[in-house]
Amino acid sequence: MKDDFNDEEEVQSFGYKRFGIQEGNECTKCKNDWALRVAIALLYVLCALLTIAVAVLGYKVVQRMDNVTEGMQNYGGKITAVETDLKKLDDQTGEKSENATSELHSFKLEFQTLQKQLSDVIVKTSNNRAVLKELQLAGEDMQSGHLSLRDLLESNANVISKVNHTLNTYNSLIDGLKTETARLQSDLHVQTSEQGQNSHSISTLNFTQTQQRNLISSLQRSVEDTGQAVQKLKNDYQSLQQVARQTKADADWLREKVQNLQALAANNSLLTRSNSDSLEDVTSQLTTLSEQVQNTSTITDSHDQSLRELMDQQRDHDNATSIRFDALEARLDSNEGEMDRITGNVSFTTQLLRAISTDLNGLRTCSETVTRHSELLHGLNNSVAETRAESTELKAQQEELAVRLDKEVSSLSIVMDEMKLVDNKHSQLITNFTILQGPPGPRGPRGDKGSMGLPGKTGPKGEKGEKGAPGDAGPKGEKGPAGPPGVPGLKGPPGSRGSPGPKGSRGSGGRQGPSGEKGDPGIPGMPGRDGQPGPTGPQGPQGLRGPAGPAGLEGARGPVGPIGPPGPPGLPGLPAPPIVVPPVDPQGFVNRQVAPPPTTTPGCPPQWKGFREQCYHFSAPMESLNFDEAKERCSNLSSSMLIINDEEEQLWIKRQISGKGYFWLGLKWKPGQPDNWSHGHEAGEDCAGLIHEASWNDFFCTERIGFICERTNESKVPVL
C-alpha cells in the first residue's frame, strides 16, 4: 500500500524535463505568441484533465484499497477467531501452541503438530486398548477373587460364629470365675480380718512378753542383788562362826585355865546368843527370798508355756494360710492362662479381620482405579473425536482461506497491472509537453490514523523463571484406613545412667533386739585373810625338849572373799524368726516375700547384693509400694529402678526373686500405647513389673508390690 501511494506522489510531482521539453528561445523563434498561449492553455487543460483523471484513479485505487483493507481486517478478525479457537482447543487438549501467526507456514506447522499429536493419541488409544484388555482380564481375575473372598468371608463368618460361641462359653466361665473370685475376695477379707486380729493379739502378746522380759530382767537383777546380799551374809555368818569357834575355844581354854573369867564367858555367851538370833533372822529372810525366787520361776515357766502355745498356734495358722494362698495363686495362675488363651484367640481373630478388611480395601481401591481409568479413557475418546471434528473444520476453513487469499492476490495483481498501464499511458501523453514546475503547495492536512497492523511472529520461548513461593498448605485429608501392624522394632540401647539423687533422710530406728544369754560366772575371788591370833596365854614353865611331833591338821578354810567385777558381755544370741504377715494387694494377689539375707559384697552398701558391676537392693517382705513411691525410694537411696539389659542379668534376677512375689521395673508405657488395656477400669495398666520366672507384665501404677533398686559398684568405678 505504501509503495502505491509513493508512486502516486511521484506521478503528481514529477517534472517534464526528463522528456526533453525545455523552456528556451527556440519556441519563440519558431512560433508566435498566440501559439504559445494556445499551447499553454491546452497544457493547462490537459493538466486539469490529468489531475482529474489521476484523482479519479486515486479515488478508485483508495476505494479498492479500503475494500482490500476491510477484507484484510475481516480476515484478521477471522484469523484471530481461528487463533482463539485454536487456543480453546489447546486448553481442552492440554497442549499449548507456541507459534500461532497469520502466516500459512505457521498454520501448516501447527497442523503437522496436530497430526503428530493425533497420531500420538491414536498410539495411546491403541496402548490404552491393550491396557483396557489387561484391566478387563484383571477385572475378571478380581471377580474370581471376589468369589473366592466371598467363600473365605463365609468360612470366616462361620469361624467367627464358632468363636462367638466359644466366647459365650468363656463368658459363662468368666462369670463363674467372677463369682469364685468374689467368694475368694470375701474369704480373703475374712482372712485379712482374722489375720489383723491375730496380728493385734500377737502385738499384745509381744507387748506383754516385753513387759514380762522387763520384769524377769528386774527380778534377775533383784535376785543377783539378793544373791550378793546372801553371799555377804554367808561371809558374815562364816566370820561369825569362826568368831564363835574362837570364842568357844577361848571359853574352853578359859574354863580350863581361868575360873575368874566366868563373868567374861557369860558375857560372851550372851553375845553368841544375840549373834545366833541375828543368824536366825538372816536365815528366815533367805528362806523368804528363795520362796519369792521360786514363785517368779513358776510364773515365768507358765508364761513361757503360754508363749510356746501361742507360737505353735500362730505357726499352724501361718501354714494353713500359706497353703490356702498357694492354692489361690495356682487357681489364679490357671485363670490367667485361660484369659491369655482367650485374648490370644481374640487377637488372632482381629488380625484375620484386619487382613480381610485390608484385602477388601485393596479390592475397593482397584475397582475405583478401574472405574477412574475407564472414565479417563471415555474422556480421551470423546476428546479425540472432538479433535478430529475440529481438525476437519480447520482444514475446511484453511482451504477456504487459501482460495480467498488466492483470489485477493490475483485481484491485487490485476490492479497493479492496470496501474502500470495507466502510468505508461500518462508517460506517453506527457512526453510532448513542458510543464513548468510551480511552487510547492501548502502542506496537506494530516491523514487519519491507519488500521492496526497484523500481529508479528511469536518470539522465542523465554528462559525458565525462578521457582515461585510455596503455596498455602491444603486442607487436611481424610484419615486413611489403619495399616497392618508393623514389625516390632529392635531393642534400643540402654540409656545413660542418671545423676545420683540427694542423700535420703535417716531411717527410723529398728526394734530392740532380744536380750542375750546370761554370761559365764566371774573368776573366783582371792582367798580370805587369815583369822586374828588368839590372846596370848600365861607363860608356862619351861618343859623338857620333847621329840618332834607329827605335822598338825590343816586349819579351817577362811571366809569367801568379796564378789569380783562382772565379766565381759557375752556374744549376742541368734535373732528370733520374724513373724511374716503376707500383704494383700487390691487385686487379691498375695506377696510371699522373704527378706534377703545381708551380704558383704565389696563396693556395695549393707543389705545390697552385687552382680557384675552393679549393686541391687531388694525390698523387704512387708515393704510394698506403688510405682511412684518405689521410684522416690530408689532415688532417695542414690539409685534407680531396675532395668534388665541382658539374659544373664535376667537369670540372676530370676534366681533372686523366685517365690518372693512381684517387683516393679523402671519401665512405663507412654500415653496411648496399644497395650494400654483398661480391663474394665478407668485407667490403663501403664507400669511394668516382674512376675513369675522374671517375666514382665504391665500393672496398674497404683498397685503395691515389691521393688528393686540398682546402682553401680563403687569398687569397680574407673579412677580418672
Swiss-Prot record:
Residues 460-479 have a biased composition (Basic and acidic residues). Scavenger receptor that displays several functions associated with host defense. Binds to carbohydrates. The chain crosses the membrane at residues 38-58. Residues 562-576 have a biased composition (Pro residues). The keyword Transmembrane applies. It comes from the Eukaryota. Residues 504-513 have a biased composition (Gly residues). Ca(2+) 3 binds at residues 673, 675, 685, 697-698. Ca(2+) 2 binds at residues 676, 685-686. Disulfide bonds join 604-615, 634-709, 687-701. GO terms for cellular component: collagen trimer; collagen-containing extracellular matrix; extracellular space; membrane. Residues 1-37 are cytoplasmic. A carbohydrate binds at residues 670, 673, 675, 685, 697-698. The keyword Lipoprotein does not apply. Residues 433-576 are annotated as: Disordered. GO terms for biological process: phagocytosis, recognition; vasculogenesis. SMART domains: CLECT. This is Collectin-12. Residues 444-503, 510-569 form the Collagen-like domain. Keywords: Calcium, Coiled coil, Collagen, Disulfide bond, Lectin, Membrane, Metal-binding, Receptor, Repeat, Signal-anchor, Transmembrane, Transmembrane helix. The gene is colec12. Ca(2+) 1 binds at residues 643, 645, 649, 710. Residues 95-120, 216-267, 377-408 form a coiled coil. It holds the Pfam family Lectin_C. It is a single-pass type II membrane protein. Residues 59-720 are extracellular.
